[in-house]
Each structure stands twice: as C-alpha cells, then as structure tokens.
From Swiss-Prot:
GO terms for molecular function: 6,7-dimethyl-8-ribityllumazine synthase activity. 5-amino-6-(D-ribitylamino)uracil binds at F21, A55, F56, E57, T79, V80, I81, F112. Belongs to the DMRL synthase family. GO terms for cellular component: cytosol; riboflavin synthase complex. It catalyses: (2S)-2-hydroxy-3-oxobutyl phosphate + 5-amino-6-(D-ribitylamino)uracil = 6,7-dimethyl-8-(1-D-ribityl)lumazine + phosphate + 2 H2O + H(+). Disulfide bonds: none annotated. Keywords: Riboflavin biosynthesis, Transferase. It is an enzyme of class 2 (transferase). This is 6,7-dimethyl-8-ribityllumazine synthase. It comes from Bacillus thuringiensis (strain Al Hakam).
Length: 153
C-alpha cells in the first residue's frame, strides 16, 4: 500500500509562527505561505498567525500552537543570516532542533520554513525571487503532511 497526502486544504486549520527579525524577508515568506494555503483551499479564517521577536523564539510558540489541539499543522517561518560572529550557528542549530522535535513530541506536523543563509541576497532569492518562495513551499508541505498524518490517527 502507498500512503500519500493530498494537496486540498479545505477544512484544515493551520497555525503559522513568524520571526519578526529580518522582517523584510519574513513578511515575504508569510505572504508566500498565506498564498499557498489559500490557493489550496484553506480558508482565511482557518489560518492563525503568531509573530515572535526572532527565529530563536519560534519553537516555543510553535509547540504551544501544536499542543493546543486547534491545528492540523503548524508552519514556522524565519530568516537567520550569517553575520561576523558565531551567533548564527547557535541560533540555526537550536531553532532547527527545536522545530524538528516538535512533530515527534506533539503528533502534529510542524514544518520548518526557516531560512538559514550566508547572505542577504540568498535570503531574498528564497523569499520569492530566483529560488521560489520557501513560505509557499512550506504551506504546501503542511497541507500534504496534515493529510498524510491523519491516515494513522
């Protein structure tokens, strides 16, 4: 037997957590995610968005959303751009670990849509220009995973 999630979002409730740091990028990711959800049938009133200060704060609010029982999936969006210090490495590692563990802890798909880039240009490319919009891609993944995970509910 083959299990797959379908890409029809009708009836799904989705939470989105967005880091405000680098908002000129994260707002584009959010726009892409909202577009992706709506294009696939998720109603606007079935989408909740929570803004947090930065990427490091994303896992806590994503966990609270996932544990609330209100959502079929949670999308995390943020942008971490390498600077001159090791701060980038710590933030990227902790956010990735934190978000990755949430699906396993909560049984709710939590999608990692956090950009971790070397340059501002790379982030811009992934927020709706050359390399597509990772927010949109995260929305599609959330819909697919929500349906796929329900097959074992």
């Amino acid at each position: 037997m083959v299990f797959e999630g379908h890409l029809v979002g009708t009836g799904l409730k989705v939470g989105v957590v967005v880091g405000r740091f680098n908002e000129f990028i994260t707002s584009k990711l959010l726009g892409g995610a909202l577009d992706g959800l709506k294009r696939h049938g998720v109603e606007e009133n079935d989408i909740d968005v929570a803004w947090v200060p930065g990427a490091f704060e994303i896992p806590l609010i994503a966990k609270k959303m996932a544990n609330s029982g209100k959502y079929d999936a949670v999308i995390t969006l943020g942008t971490v751009i390498r600077g001159a210090t090791t701060h980038y490495d710590y933030v990227c590692n902790e956010v990735a670990k934190g978000v990755a563990s949430l699906s396993l802890q909560t049984d709710i798909p939590v999608i990692f849509g956090v950009l971790t880039t070397e340059t501002i240009e790379q982030a811009i490319e992934r927020a709706g220009t050359k390399a597509g919009n990772k927010g949109y891609e995260s929305a599609v993944a959330a819909i697919e995973m929500a349906h796929l995970s329900k097959q074992w509910a």
